[in-house]
Amino acid sequence: AEAASEKLSDRSEADKLKAACEVSKAVCASLVKEKKTAAPPKLFDLTSLQREANRLFGYTAKQTLDLAQALYEKRLLTYPRTDSAFLTDDMGDTAAGIIKLLCGKFSFMAGKDFTPELGKVLNSKKVSDHHAIIPTMELAKTDLATLPESERNILTLAGARLLMATAAVHTFEAVTATFECAGQSFTAKGKTVLYDGWKEIDRRYRAALKNKPETDDADSDTEKTLPPFTEGQTFENPTAKVTEHDTTPPKP
């Protein structure tokens, strides 16, 4: 496991600390474990579809709207000009049928036993004029390979989001370990996945894309899995290294 000290602005000071650590012992001073969950993402409204299509494929907002409109006119996607991220309460059976269809159509769902939690996406009170953007049952009559790649990207993106939105929560244990070495504190962060939930579908979907985008998880700094530690555990002559990082200004 890697543990980092606080930032040091002086390179020579960092080099001295590195040398001191390598002839010292590191002690696990504290170990904090916290069970956390990450809820599935919501279904797409137009704005969130445009944002995600830009992140994954580089499409502009207008390109995404035009592609979604073309799919709507082919009856493969529901009405795209919506500000709702939910389906109406009476759409449970429809959504279940579409999800079953998607599991058979999408190669990245092969071998995945999936039972949707439909209650997460049904809420008539949060639907005004039009419900969230999802594929339609017309997809059953369509070979995805015959669609233009850009349209296929949008349709698959909307379908993958329906699967993720109805999947189980992602449950993990966040671990923060603090070590003392050569008079300096070092911190290591990691996670232990308890139940993968919707993130397994997210990984499967991203792995199937031509260009593999990085996850945009807010908890990406805790993605590493740490080996088991106990408080008071010691490590003789730990390996140390100095790394340089550019500071980034705060976002406005």
Summary of predicted features, one role per range:
Residues A1-P252:
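Core catalytic DNA strand-manipulation module of type IA topoisomerases
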